[in-house]
Amino acid sequence: MLTDKFKKNADALRHKKLFLLDMDGTIYNENSIFEGTLDFLSQIEKNGGRYIFITNNSSKSVKDYVEKVNRMGITADASHFYTSSQATAFYLQENYPGQTVFCMGTRSLVAELEQNGIRVVTKPEDSASVVLIGFDTENTSEKVRDTCIMLGREVAYLA
């Protein structure tokens, strides 16, 4: 019988094939992996399942997350992640194809968008028809000013 941390029956998990897992506060806290995480992920794979880490934190790229969890001992590659940055890139491709996006966000967010074929600018440009604001751990007053300038124009606004 498969049991959880509290010795309760967890056999129902054996038949699940896909686990969507949040990261910070669920499998780790900042840079410390929670006890039992590696065993849990290993058990998923032993049972023929797959796990995907999901996050609404747009400040890091998939590459950043892969490196972070690998440092903690978790074997994962880009196929193990779905981030809000990726979802935003897909949304922009679908709803604003070929348009230029002004982005107020981290360098990782900008890189993630560019890797997904989005033309991104970080300074006010007339060519930008979409303003995107992401969680920005690198925010400056200049970025806020530039974003305000862009929002004063006729642009689509996403956050």
Predicted regions, residues:
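HAD-like aspartate-dependent phosphatase fold
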Residues: 1-23, 27-159
